[in-house]
Amino acid sequence: MSYKVNSSYPDSIPPTEQPYMASQYKQDLQSNIAMATNSEQQRQQQQQQQQQQQQWINQPTAENSDLKEKMNCKNTLNEYIFDFLTKSSLKNTAAAFAQDAHLDRDKGQNPIDGPKSKENNGNQNTFSKVVDTPQGFLYEWWQIFWDIFNTSSSRGGSEFAQQYYQLVLQEQRQEQIYRSLAVHAARLQHDAERRGEYSNEDIDPMHLAAMMLGNPMAPAVQMRNVNMNPIPIPMVGNPIVNNFSIPPYNNANPTTGATAVAPTAPPSGDFTNVGPTQNRSQNVTGWPVYNYPMQPTTENPVGNPCNNNTTNNTTNNKSPVNQPKSLKTMHSTDKPNNVPTSKSTRSRSATSKAKGKVKAGLVAKRRRKNNTATVSAGSTNAGSPNITTPGSATSEPAMVGSRVNKTPRSDIATNFRNQAIIFGEEDIYSNSKSSPSLDGASPSALASKQPTKVRKNTKKASTSAFPVESTNKLGGNSVVTGKKRSPPNTRMSRRKSTPSVILNADATKDENNMLRTFSNTIAPNIHSAPPTKTANSLPFPGINLGSFNKPAVSSPLSSVTESCFDPESGKIAGKNGPKRAVNSKVSASSPLSIATPRSGDAQKQRSSKVPGNVVIKPPHGFSTTNLNITLKNSKIITSQNNTVSQELPNGGNILEAQVGNDSRSSKGNRNTLSTPEEKKPSSNNQGYDFDALKNSSSLLFPNQAYASNNRTPNENSNVADETSASTNSGDNDNTLIQPSSNVGTTLGPQQTSTNENQNVHSQNLKFGNIGMVEDQGPDYDLNLLDTNENDFNFINWEG
């Protein structure tokens, strides 16, 4: 921009008197410079845009023959149709089709003749890309397409097409499974990255999925195939992702469905989520093999006795409890249907029952069953007898009481307490008198004068005694039960859940051949203590033929059942129920049977009966057994080589049990059943003679023997000859006493006490610690003169 100079101002400098004009000129100059600069920038930008547009317009596009061919699919199809018509010798049809389809051909040639490659190579650009086949490519393609289409649409097809189609389907399934597992692996990898546990491992998704499923698989290797891309495949645009059934990849419970995959070897050591939880908290699908049908465990809340020999020690397996309704009685056929059973809680006494059963006659005898149960000793526990049922090859351990299983208000405590009352203290809680045959010499008659201490002993004894189930004369089963205040009469219960020794007799035998027995069924305590040593008060040293040094099992109480034994049939029949007990604070008792004459007037029987034998047989399976027997009104025959009789004084009065001090107690104030002191052998070489021995393996004492013979009131000494139970007849009484083990017997001190009444002279014998040969236990025969149940103050087996 040019400015004109004023003629009046040659230097083009305005005068001073016009200051405003100078500043305005300066501003106009700056604005003009700025406008000129902006206009040039805009002009340059416009030129650049024009150049870019020109370059975009003038930019040549790359020609691609394949792209053109794909874009012109219809033209390609027309060319293949023309090729098919030409090779099918349809020249006129091909020329007409080429003319109508506007195909590029040599116009100088006749369309009927078709294109000629030799003359028109330069002009046939369109047909240069057609695949040359003998019959035309379109025909061959159509054959393959139609065959596969029929196969896929279940319309048939050739065999090769079907095989090809199956291969294609299998490949598609594998690819689909692989894609699904890859997606799952990507998800796991993403979760691991979020937790900070991923360190850029390159793992095959198939191996990872198999490892997560718990299936064994070869170690993962580096993937080398391009198609096996470890990168998660995006599922967008793939419509057939979820169209195939895929096996589950994380199924913790294999029992939920049929398609569940059971884990075989989880990669980690934790089987809590993948393995079945069958034995995690209980004995689950079956009863333990340790339990027997009639033997509840110590967890039994009903109060039934438990078997302490069959304790289940499994860590995670608790033994189930057999409810009373599921318990099956040992002999369900012993109870006849036509014999009524008394439902009264008070039953008759033993003597009244005996009289009533005698009146029943032979008709009641024919109704008896011949089922018996044998009591043998357990091999593992010396105090646990086994019960063997006839016809069975196996034996079950008998019920063993435990002090741990104390349930004062349960049925077992009631039964124990009732046993103590009936067996030992039958006159304490009763307002009625005992039978006349038992009043004369019953130890409990005098013991009832001290009800306080006896009751204390009874409570301690009540937790380990068991009811005895015996078959009466009519063949019915009866279980001893009772309350705390029950009379001396026994209670007859129909409960069959408690296994016990069942005794019966042959109904065809005469009553005169039936022998009275006392069957002792005991329940030793687990908490056993070694046997205490007692001083030998006899004039000769105690005989010890071998001690196995096993602890004795102590039991406070043993229940006695009066029974009948038939010597010809060898069977035992329970009679009159349980009788009475002796001292309740004694060592462990074992099953014992002592043959005595029939009940009744004891003094009358002594004058009319001939001597009988008491056969003490050692039980099977015990290693040591101590037998304590207190006899009354007997004589001791001492000798070195010959048996010399030495009579004890006999007052001739009725036998009376007297309360004295127990020599086994350190206090000396406990009441115990004992008898006055008797005479002892006068020589150190003198001993007690076992007069009759059953077999060759019996105990033989050289120069020492014991024979206990009673005197009749007319001072006639009758010594019983050696007889057996099977050959006894008439009024001779012979029975077997079957304790429970391999017995060893040592003559021990006499436990006697003196009192102001010297009418009864008793002797306390203790046989203990005699070594026996296995399975050959001896039989100990004590010749007793007319011995009945009143002649035994104390019968006890320790072992």
UniProtKB/Swiss-Prot annotation:
Function, in words: Required for diploid filamentous growth, haploid invasive growth and flocculation. Putative transcriptional activator of FLO1.
Organism: Saccharomyces cerevisiae (strain Lalvin EC1118 / Prise de mousse)
Biological processes, Gene Ontology terms: regulation of biosynthetic process
Comp. bias (Polar residues): 270-285, 318-340, 371-395, 460-480, 584-593, 660-675
Family, per entry: Belongs to the FLO8 family.
Alphabetical keyword list: Activator, Nucleus, Transcription, Transcription regulation
InterPro entries found in the cross-reference section: LisH (IPR006594)
Lineage: Eukaryota, Fungi, Dikarya, Ascomycota, Saccharomycotina
Disulfide pairings: none
Protein location: Nucleus
Chain spans, region Disordered: 37-68, 101-127, 255-406, 431-501, 568-622, 644-691, 705-758
Name listed for the protein in its UniProt record: Transcriptional activator FLO8
Record carries keyword Thylakoid: no
Recorded GO CC terms: nucleus
Location of the LisH domain: 73-105
Keyword RNA-binding recorded: no
Chief place of localization: nucleus
Biased composition (Basic residues): 354-370, 482-497
Ranges of compositional bias, category Low complexity: 41-55, 307-317, 341-353
